[in-house]
Amino acid sequence: MDSLHVLRSFLLLFIVFNHLPRTTTSMSEPKVITIDVNQAQKLLDSGYTFLDVRTVEEFKKGHVDSENVFNVPYWLYTPQGQEINPNFLKHVSSLCNQTDHLILGCKSGVRSLHATKFLVSSGFKTVRNMDGGYIAWVNKRFPVKVEHKELKYDEL
């Protein structure tokens, strides 16, 4: 009877442990380094490239002003809703090498976090996410640039 009790206990433990949710290990999740805007500004001054992953419209209204700044939207707004830009990696790869030093930013740091994970998992080596995004950059009164559009006569 004693061995039957041990067998039942073992079987119960096996069933319980086999059905517990499994946590993902760090090997499956790319390691993302997030930096604040003070660190971002220092790295940009040292030669890092800034990749703004907001929409083109957001970018034109104002963006980080630095020597190497590119706009490649990570999310697109389509009639079906918000979708990941299917050409994101192709566009980034046409502008940057996988060994380039990149800082990614968006409005608040959420889109850029996802984009940073994507680039790291795609083989980019030195990628940083800017915490707080453009909002934090502006709040620190760091340099910004606004893309001026040509006004048409009827817009004057």
UniProtKB/Swiss-Prot annotation:
Catalytic residues in the record: 106
Source species: Arabidopsis thaliana (Mouse-ear cress)
Entry's Gene Ontology molecular function annotations: catalytic activity
CDD domains: RHOD
Domain of life: Eukaryota
Annotated PANTHER family: RHODANESE-LIKE DOMAIN-CONTAINING PROTEIN 17, THIOSULFATE SULFURTRANSFERASE 18
Record-linked InterPro entries: Rhodanese-like_dom (IPR001763), Rhodanese-like_dom_sf (IPR036873), STR17/STR18/HARC1-like (IPR044684)
Name of the featured protein: Rhodanese-like domain-containing protein 17
SUPFAM superfamilies xref list: Rhodanese/Cell cycle control phosphatase (SSF52821)
Rhodanese domain ranges (all copies): 44-146
Family matches, as Pfam families: Rhodanese (PF00581)
